[in-house]
Amino acid sequence: QSNDDFIWNAVAGAEFPGSTVTAEADGFKTLISGSTANVRVATGTSATAITGSTAYTQLTGMIAAADPNIVDASDLTFFCGISVFQRIVNGLTTQNLFHFDPTTVKSRGGFYEVPLPGYPNVVIVGGWGLRSSERVILGPASDMYVGTDLTSDTSNYQLWYDINSDTIKYRLRNKLGTQVGHAHYYVSNDLA
């Protein structure tokens, strides 16, 4: 959860909340925003916070705003926080879309995923990193990159038993960074 939080919310040069780590690179939320050159920003209804009654219209509006070169990408993905994801699923369920099956929601280690009805190549992913945000981002998942320096883990890893709390604890110091390949492939509603 902490890594996912960092991957999405890091701001270069700022100390990450709840830690002593100063981020050296921006997270996806900063990289895929209206302040980044070429990122498309949703307009109209799609630029507002997702509500159950308008979720489908808002998401399809973001698809309409996407670069035509990626609309048929096999991994086109909406990224959002878990609470926004729940509103989307609730909205799709209450709209009684004949081709939406709420039992298709998958839980994958703290992430949730469901296909977007009517779009066989589009999934909606709710994750920890955007949990306190109304931000919704659309783009090809394969164009988002996370890098790390895992080769140094053996020298930066500590494991110990804490007798006071009767727990095994560990500390791992490594570098973690994010990047997108093509900013113009992404659409953001640009909400906080």
Where are these regions (language model features)?
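Internal mixed-charge
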Residues: S2-D4, I82, G126
